[in-house]
Amino acid sequence: MSVIKRALISLSDKAGAVEFAQNLHKLGVEILSTGGTAKLLAGAGVPVIEVADYTGFPEMLDGRVKTLHPKIHGGILGRRDLDEHVAKMEEHGIGNIDLVCVNLYPFAATIAKPGCTLEDAIENIDIGGPTMVRSAAKNWKHVAIVTDTADFPAIAAELEANNGALSDKTRFNLSRKAFSHTAQYDGMISNYLTSLSDGVLSGEPEIGEFPSRFNQSWIKVQDMRYGENPHQRAAFYRDIDPAAGSLSAYNQLQGKELSYNNIADADAAWEAVKSFDAPACVIVKHANPCGVAVAADTLTAYKLAYATDTTSAFGGIIAFNREVDGETVKQITDNQFMEVLMAPKFTAEALEIAAAKKNVRVLEVPLKAGANRFELKRVGGGLLVQTPDINRINRADLKVVSKRQPTEQEWNDLLFVWNVAKYVKSNAIVFGKGGQTYGIGAGQMSRVDSTRIAARKAQDAGLDLNGACAASDAFFPFRDGVDVIAEQGIKAIIHPAGSMRDQEVFDAADEHGIAMAVTGIRHFRH
């Protein structure tokens, strides 16, 4: 391990920079810096040499040229173990730079701003920064590169413990992280530039929805015991910039390691439960809700959701959008076996009760609004990319196509079952009343078969469908689905419409005295 004697610090994100530089100074490290970073460190009393003074060449071209100098890159790239390199560096007065701390211009934040122009974006493409990062990362055996300010405390601690030196393992890991950082940065620039239409050059609207080259960066969270089935290998990766409130932000409080299927099902449950404003419970099995309810509190919501399908709930994923108390957890553990229990927060009593079921995976997930920019689905040799289905409707968005108008209670129930249907695999039919699902028919090739399954589920659960409401995620291709619904005593239906036989479907509703509202929006889910 070689001792670090000279460091170059040039940061856009300066979090923790002063404390880190102070630690370096205590170890006798000479610090080079640029622009705002140099001012920050000097203002905090840290001795700093401006890069322009070190190279004897001023910053120029509005700061575009600061560190692009042989004395900088020679000091970073020179191999200390090659006599020829050492001799050339001595000949040209190039000293070693042993530590480089650089992060890059905030390109992502820039293009996310409303009204960002091509010129704004171009000016926030870093050139000198990535060049230094790649130089240091390439020469990792002799130079340490830090691109993440979150690493400062650990690096400072290791330097102090090793008399100013870093291990080969640390330097190699920092190098790998640095190359990933620049790859992600360049991919982001490529995504932006290739999403622009040619009209950008003439001042026309600049950015399209999808780039012509699509780059994504992911960070591995864990290797998994196996994939969807035991003979498949698998790992879980997190988006490098996940949407607020995403499942990937989970904190596991107890239980066995999450499996591939646990994560897939938990994501389905979480996306569904966070779509409700009122306290809600969603129980999921094989990525499909088998029970959903909204109520005044988590205990009542769970009881109602569980009552929809007590058989399918066994071994399911249970999600809440409110803090969960001990009474709720006790009710769950008394009722059923579960794989995962998730909520934004749990009381101390709830966690104490859950601890008795040590294998149950308990997850806290921040409850924040937000959705991924894109949804991705692999196909053979390709990738399907779409914007997420986050459409929400209210009563004013609906058109009544029946003679009978929905009652006030039916309006509420229609909106509830419609929201649930969005998270059920197509063909999806959802029956419900009073903020509780009464029957869910999922994943059938025939819509009328899904309707019959939903009816059978309600019958098996002993739930009376008289006066309930029904939702269909897509239009009814024939009137048969409406006829089956009417046989159950259901009095209101919500669906998108759009079939060639819409009028037959509307007429069937009138024949049965059913109130029918159409959304004009479909919610297929595959």
Curated annotation (Swiss-Prot):
Q: Which SMART domains match?
A: AICARFT_IMPCHas, MGS
Q: What is its EC number?
A: 2.1.2.3, 3.5.4.10
Q: Output the InterPro entries linked to this UniProt entry.
A: AICAR_Tfase_dup_dom_sf, Cytidine_deaminase-like, MGS-like_dom, MGS-like_dom_sf, PurH-like
User: Is Protein transport set as a keyword in this record?
Assistant: no
Its pathway, per UniProt, is: Purine metabolism; IMP biosynthesis via de novo pathway; 5-formamido-1-(5-phospho-D-ribosyl)imidazole-4-carboxamide from 5-amino-1-(5-phospho-D-ribosyl)imidazole-4-carboxamide (10-formyl THF route): step 1/1; Purine metabolism; IMP biosynthesis via de novo pathway; IMP from 5-formamido-1-(5-phospho-D-ribosyl)imidazole-4-carboxamide: step 1/1
Q: Which PROSITE patterns match?
A: MGS
Every MGS-like domain range:
1-147
* Keyword field: Hydrolase, Multifunctional enzyme, Purine biosynthesis, Transferase
Q: Name one GO molecular function term.
A: IMP cyclohydrolase activity
Kindly list the biological process annotations in GO that this record carries.
Answer: 'de novo' IMP biosynthetic process
From the UniProt record, list the reaction(s) this protein catalyses. Answer: (6R)-10-formyltetrahydrofolate + 5-amino-1-(5-phospho-beta-D-ribosyl)imidazole-4-carboxamide = 5-formamido-1-(5-phospho-D-ribosyl)imidazole-4-carboxamide + (6S)-5,6,7,8-tetrahydrofolate; IMP + H2O = 5-formamido-1-(5-phospho-D-ribosyl)imidazole-4-carboxamide
- In the UniProt record, which is one GO cellular component term? cytosol
Q: What NCBIfam families does the record point to?
A: PRK00881.1 (NF002049), purH (TIGR00355)
Q: Which family does it belong to?
A: Belongs to the PurH family.
Q: What is known of its domains?
A: The IMP cyclohydrolase activity resides in the N-terminal region.
Protein name as it appears in the record: Bifunctional purine biosynthesis protein PurH
